[in-house]
Amino acid sequence: MYKFRIQGSDKPLSGEVTISGAKNAALPILFASLLAEEPVEVANVPKLRDVDTTMELLKRLGAEVSRNGSVHIDASGVNDFCAPYDLVKTMRASIWALGPLVARFGKGQVSLPGGCAIGARPVDLHIHGLEQLGATIKLEEGYVKAEVDGRLKGAHIVMDKVSVGATITVMCAATLAEGTTVLENAAREPEIVDTANFLNAIGAKVSGMGTDTITIEGVERLGGGYHEVVADRIETGTFLVAAAVSGGKIVCKNTKAHLLEAVLAKLEEAGADVQTGDDWISLDMTGRELKAVNIRTAPHPAFPTDMQAQFTLLNMMAKGSGIITETIFENRFMHIPELQRMGAHAEIEGNTAICGDTDGLSGAQVMATDLRASASLVIAGCIAKGETIVDRIYHIARGYDKIEDKLTALGANIERVHSDDL
């Protein structure tokens, strides 16, 4: 079991960091490659545990998968239609295999997935969407099993609630359906737009992505193509917050400002000087006072839930107090008790956290509880006084590509160590 050992410092985190491709776009795109009858090349794919698991799953299904810079996938030889428990037990994204399998092959089954411990993430919306396209769904022996006689049929679908995952499932499956599908109350996240752009690159006819109404005109087959994954807006925001809370100056390269406008607006409200270019974002906190801000998470284009933990830390270190309201997931303040172990001030009332006016942090042994919470603990360790040990860092490996190397380049003193060496 590996942990992070961090020697805290009052030295600002400053420098340049190159942002990786977005995990939340790369995963659905890799699964969507199952729709293609010809080879596809996907560039700018981050090197993450979930990506490795997805590539292994595609191989298990019969696809040829290799990585040489880009990820190359040839799904022409897929001959197995089951995503087994041993591969998907740690990754809820595996549900995205179901839509492409049933759309192209008429059948598919996926073990009910796992993932982060941040509340209920039911697959009901995925199932309901596929049923409206004509699939028959059964839940048996821990598996979601889908079948259709012939092709799926286009439908007018109104999502019961805004869901990124279910929007992707329905959008991908509908590409090979007979007729046109109109998906209303669709999620609008940039990663959905990117997935749609990939689908169009291999021959799909998807329009309206980025709005709440997506139209998919079904085609008989999808070929091959090339696509470059969009930049990771959450990794971008995480490093911007790291610079802000440490009083540093940073340039994030290979990223786009339009992906995280709500986050940039809150950073400016917190007192940071934020500048943007075609493929970069800079933040300068030198000589500036960090001010607490109020945050309410909501579906895109509002403030993203995946940046909530990082802004919880920002508010703790800022002047004044800020109110953070979490509307997307229950049980997503699990990082706060860990930050309190380091001396942070916060009160939790239901889905609201009030934090601020923390007079410095002290190093401590803390435990990561989910992907984004772990990022806030790592940043806290960088600015705390003394040594911090972050346990269960396998969470962070699911979503951040070489985070310790990137933080080291900004001046942090962080190393990955085995438990036996502590």
Swiss-Prot record:
Q: Which SUPFAM superfamilies match?
A: EPT/RTPC-like
InterPro entries, per database record: Enolpyruvate_Tfrase_dom (IPR001986), Enolpyruvate_Tfrase_sf (IPR036968), MurA_subfamily (IPR050068), RNA3'P_cycl/enolpyr_Trfase_a/b (IPR013792), UDP_GlcNAc_COvinyl_MurA (IPR005750)
Q: Does the keyword Cell inner membrane apply?
A: no
Binding of UDP-N-acetyl-alpha-D-glucosamine, residues:
R92, R121, P122, V123, D124, L125, K161, V162, S163, V164, D306, I328
State the source organism's domain of life: Bacteria
- The residues the record assigns to binding phosphoenolpyruvate are K23, N24
Question: What's one GO-annotated cellular component?
Answer: cytoplasm
Any Pfam family hit: EPSP_synthase
- What molecular functions are annotated in GO for this chain? UDP-N-acetylglucosamine 1-carboxyvinyltransferase activity
Q: Which residues carry this modification: 2-(S-cysteinyl)pyruvic acid O-phosphothioketal?
A: C116
GO BP field: cell division; cell wall organization; peptidoglycan biosynthetic process; regulation of cell shape; UDP-N-acetylgalactosamine biosynthetic process
Q: Which reaction does it catalyse?
A: phosphoenolpyruvate + UDP-N-acetyl-alpha-D-glucosamine = UDP-N-acetyl-3-O-(1-carboxyvinyl)-alpha-D-glucosamine + phosphate
What main location does UniProt list?
A: cytoplasm
Enzyme Commission identifier(s):
2.5.1.7
Matching CDD domains: UdpNAET (cd01555)
Keywords attached to this Swiss-Prot or TrEMBL record, sorted alphabetically, are: Cell cycle, Cell division, Cell shape, Cell wall biogenesis/degradation, Cytoplasm, Peptidoglycan synthesis, Pyruvate, Transferase
Cite the annotated pathway.
Cell wall biogenesis; peptidoglycan biosynthesis
Q: Where in the cell is it found?
A: Cytoplasm
**What function does this protein fulfil?**
Cell wall formation. Adds enolpyruvyl to UDP-N-acetylglucosamine.
> Which family, according to the similarity comment?
Belongs to the EPSP synthase family. MurA subfamily.
NCBIfam families annotated for this entry?
A: murA, PRK09369.1
Protein name, please?
UDP-N-acetylglucosamine 1-carboxyvinyltransferase
Q: Which organism is it from?
A: Aliivibrio fischeri (strain ATCC 700601 / ES114) (Vibrio fischeri)
Q: What is the lineage of its organism?
A: Bacteria, Pseudomonadati, Pseudomonadota, Gammaproteobacteria, Vibrionales
